Amino acid sequence: MALAVVGLCCWQITPASGAEQWPQQSDPLRIAEPGVPLSPPQSVPSEPLADGAHLFNSPEPSLHGPTPKTLAEFVDLAQRSHPKLRSARASIEAARGKAVQAKLYPNPVMAGLSPQIAGDQSQWSGTVAQDFVTAGKLRLAQQAALREVQQSEYMLIRARFDVLREVRQSYYALLVSQRRVQIYKLLLDISKRSYEIGSQLAQAGEGTRADVLFWSIERDRAEVRLLNASVYIETGRRQLATAIALPRADIGTLDADLFQKLPQFELKTLQEAVVQANAQPRAAEANIARAQWMLERAAVQPIPNINLMGGYQRQVGIPAMDQGLVQVMMTVPLFDRNQGNIRSARADIASSRADLRVIELELATQAAQAVATYRTSQRLVEWYEEYILPKARETVSLTQALYARGEVTFLSLLQAQRILTETELAFVEAQADRWNGAVTISDLLQLEEFPPDANAPAVIEAVQENGPIRPLPPP
């Protein structure tokens, strides 16, 4: 008895030379309704993504070397070491992989079988089957996946500015803490001088022991405040080190101008500029386009794919017979025409459009809140600098001189000193609010340069409609 053996070899499927290559930049989104024209995302400083493996093993900057002092140095360290950016870049690579996979053609299926293994009527056959995808389903699926790629690219841009916002906030918070230490040192010096004057007057019989004790308490309070301010300096340095993703980095005295002049912004123009410049609406538009492509993909799903099978069969016997096998199969969309998924895809488009509107409204609200904080703190800073602080400092100097000559009581000097303390601290807090507002506005506008200058969007001259406001003249 002659036996026939059908052997299956290991096949290596090699991509055709004309296979579609992955573009470095995804093509512009396709939106079927009027709206903001979409453009490719702006470039983000990063390492090449030719090989996805290095995304998870990129070396971190060394902690040794020059201690950063300027904001630009801290930003550079953060962009090279922050895990948020590495995660966002890896998400882009993952989305690109899904887009490549979406258009890969189904693999052929090979089979070998024998309905009857032994005997003079034994049969041996081998077949090859292939699914032929119709109606451009693979192309539509890849187009939807490409929108996810572009959405991930916009999210990388947003992640980068999130990191910049954290670094900028931590940087100027530490700068404010440095200024607080300087103020508390000044107040401690004032308290020590007041204590010395009170002690001398008590020894001369012009003061009392109670006066000396009061000034001793004020001196001790000023010293404790200085110690506490030093604690905030240390914690602020650790927060800044964490913001650049180098928690053990050594941070010294920062080199920046806390009193730098900043521009004013017009609210309506700023809100429009934020919606245009921010990456969140662009990512939402990418999601709308993805939903539209998914609707087209769902619409062609009922069109059946074709399954074609061909093969060879050998029947052993007398006489032996060679036969060819052919089979064509397809699904008949009689009951399931993908009605539910089509309905769901249409709802996803409506939901995505609503999400875009929600994002635009939230950004406009954030811009209004940031401008409110920024304008009020800016006005406070200007008034403290020009009018309030000079008066408070002059009051303390005059009161100290009068108290040394015994012309005023210690209560008057104490009150003047407290006014100066409250004024100096309020001035510092106004500076902190001013810089927080500037950081928030720059984050919403996604400004590369910080602090913002006169070339930033929505900047106006800081002039009131009826002229600048000034305090009332003294009576």
Predicted regions and their residues:
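Periplasmic alpha-helical coiled-coil/stalk elements that build and connect Gram-negative outer-membrane
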Residues: R158-V275, A370-T373, S377, L420, ...
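Alpha-helical coiled-coil heptad-repeat register
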Residues: H82, R89, R96, K103, ...
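Amphipathic alpha-helical coiled-coil scaffold segments and their short linker/junction regions
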Residues: E73-Q79, G207, D211-R221, L246-L308, ...
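Short segments within alpha-helical structural elements
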Residues: S39, S46, A159-R160, V224-L246, ...
